[in-house]
Amino acid sequence: MKRPPDFNRVAQIYAPMEKLTFGPWLWRCRCCFIQELKTQRIGLVLGDGDGRFTAKLLEENPLVLVDAVDASVEMLNKLRLNAGLRSARVRVHLADARAWVPEGSAYDLIATHFFLDCLATAEVAELARKIRARTSADAVWVVSEFTIPDNWFGWLVAGPLVRALYLAFFVLTGLRVQRLPKYREAMAEAGWARIKEQRLLAGLLVGELWRAQ
């Protein structure tokens, strides 16, 4: 297993960098289905960066308890800060999600926002199987990702942009993955079914809601 990228280097500038490059769009993508996550009680959030989504989830769902997993101590510190007093409902785990063993057995909410694109397809498949074994029968998984549409926009704009982003994060964090994984196929094979989808920025961004089968 390759060493995880070092996001400690960008923790302090993560949110400003995001707003500078994509404005509000990544945030809107993360929150596509936030209103449908109000009945879940035990959540697992992987690689949430500075934790703004986790903070929003805690605000919208006053009963949910969250396990937050990240390989960056600085990102976890930002998550606690953004969650404020609600951080009492969060257990943070400083770990590589690929190797971390879930402690619960009845997660009914999984969230990965712009995280699966840091993994290879085989790693997504293994992670999805591992998580499915630790979720409830009615669990949902909310996903936000970059995509490359199979059209002129994908060929001329989205594709080059995604490649540039991978190069930038290789320089900034040491991220070794350099292409988007086939996460949909991997999740489907692991027992997850996509039930909703919302595309933004001409298909460059996609928010998805999946349910355990």
Language model features with spans:
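Core SAM-dependent methyltransferase catalytic element
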Residues: A190-A193, Q198-Q213
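C-terminal alpha-helical "lid/dimerization" subdomain adjacent to the S-adenosyl-L-methionine
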Residues: S144-A190, E197
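Class I SAM-dependent methyltransferase Rossmann-like catalytic core
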Residues: M1-W25
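Conserved alpha-helix/loop element of class I SAM-dependent methyltransferases that forms part
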Residues: G23-Q40
